[in-house]
Amino acid sequence: MKKILAILMVLCLSVGILAGCGSSANAPASSGENSSASSDAASGTKKTFVFGDNTFNASNEEPTINPHEAYSGWPCIRYGVGETLMKIADDGTLEPWLAESATNVNETTWEIVIKDSVCFSNGRKCDAAAVKACLEHLIEVHERAADNLKIASIEADGQKLTIVTSQPNPVLMNYLSEAYGCIIDMDEGITDDGIVVGTGPFVATELVTDDHLNLVKNTNYWDGEVHIDEVTIRNITDGDTLALALQSGEIDAAYGMAYGSYPMFENDSFKFSGIQTSRCFWGMVNFSTENPSAAIMLDPAVRKAIALGINKQGFVDVLLNGYGYTATGAFPETFAFGQGVKAESYDPEQAKAVLQEAGWVDTDGDGIREKDGVKLVIRWLTYPTRLELPLLAESAQATLREIGMDVQINNTKDHNTIRKDPTAWDIWVSANVNAGLGDPANFFATYCLDNSVKNSGGHHSDRLEQLADQLDVTFDVNERARLAIEMQQELLDDNSYVFVSFLRMSMISKANVTGLEAHACDFYELTADLDIK
C-alpha cells in the first residue's frame, strides 16, 4: 500500500492576475542604485525595497545565489529567486510548493507530481524534465546534498518525477526542501557571478559578492501578483552600521540586527516580525590528536568543566536581552526529538572540583590552572557575521576564567578555513538552524558523524554511528524521535558538543512594510506578498 508522506495539494490557485508560462520576458535591470522604497511608494512610481542583511557574504559560505554552491541556496530561497518542491511550515511539517504531491511508492521509490502552472522567471515551463536536470546537477557538484539525498536515478514523464534512492530515505522530501533544493533552470545555466534563474517572485539582475544583489519583479510569476518592482539586498556585517542604516532610512528592513539595538526601533515608526527558531548557538570540541592542545581537549574532566562553566541563562537574559531561550540538546523541546535529554547545568563550584580532582591546579597563583606543566588554555574559534557569537565568546571567557581557564578568542570571518586546520583551534562555536527541515537527521549528518562535511573536530562514537545508520532507514516518526534523543545524549554524556541557546529570530522593518514575515526554518523572507503601503 502506498504511503502518502506529503499532503496532496487540493487548494485552488491563489486569486490574482497570474502570468502564464511563455509570456514576455522580465524587464532588464534599471541603472543606478535603488533608493529607499518609501519615497518611491509615496510618489506613485515603481516600488523599490532595500534590505540589509549581515549573512549574505562569502565568509558565511553564501557568496552567490547559486543553490548548488556551498550554502548559497539560503540567499536564493530567502530573497525569492528560488523555490523548492515542498515547503517547511512553522510547525515543521511539509507543505506542497512546486510539487502538487509526493508519494512514497516503496522504501526506495518516490513519485512527485509538479504543479502544471509552475514556470521559471524566463517563461519556460517547469516540468519534471527541468526538475530532473536541476537535481542531477545538484548531486553531481554538491557533496552534502548527494550524501543527504542518496539518489540513484531520476526519471521524468510530463509533470511526474520518479526518484529511486540507493537505500531507504524516509526524509527525502525534507532534504529536497533544504535551500540547496531550489529548482533552477539548467538550460539557462549559472552565470560566472553566480546568478541563476528560478521560479520565485524575483529575478536577479546583478550580484557583487560581499556587497549587494539587485532583483526585479518576476513578471512571469506563477503564484500570484508581485507587488515590489525592484529590490536591493545590501550586505552589512557591522551591527552598528546596520542599525544606523535602518534608523536613517537607507534601508527599509533588516535581518540579523544586534539585540542591543532593538530598543531604538521599539516605536511606531518600525515593526518587528519574530518567531522562535531552532537556530542554536553551540560549540564543537576538537578531538584531533594533531591538535597541540590534545592533552587538554581529550581530557573528559576539561570538557565537563567547560559544560559546567558556561552560564547559558545569563547569556540569554543579559546579552540576548531575553530574545532567546536556553538549550539542553541540539533541538528545542517543542519538537518530540528535542525532549528528555539531559546536560550539565551552570555550576562553577562543581566545575572547579572536577578540574581539581583531575589534577588541574593553579600552582603559580595567576588564576589559570595547569597540569604537568601545561596551562589550561582554550582557543575559542567563532565569527562576527552572527552578531551574538562574539558576545557568547566574551561571556564564556569571563565565566570560564572564574574556574581557572584562559579562553583565547579568535573571532574571524575566516573561521570556515581555520576550522579545517586541526592544529588551530580547540572549540569552534557557531549558530545553525538545527531542525529547520522538521527532522533531526540533517544536524547529525552535517556535524557529528565520521563522514559529516562539518565534523571538523573529528568526533567519533561507535554508538552514534550505529544509531545514525538506524535513523537513516527508519520511517516511523516516533522511532526517529527516540533515536535522535539517544544520539543527542551520546554527545552530551561525552561533553563533545555544548548547546547554549536557541534564537528568537526577528526582522525589523519600517512600519509601512507589509508581507515580511519571519519563519521558524529561517528560509523564507522575500515573497510575492512583500509590499509598501
Give, region by region, the residue ranges found by the protein language model:
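Append "and occasionally in soluble cytosolic enzymes with long acidic Gly/Pro-rich linkers
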Residues: 297-397, 486
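Detector for C-terminal structural segments
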Residues: 309-339, 388-397, 419-533
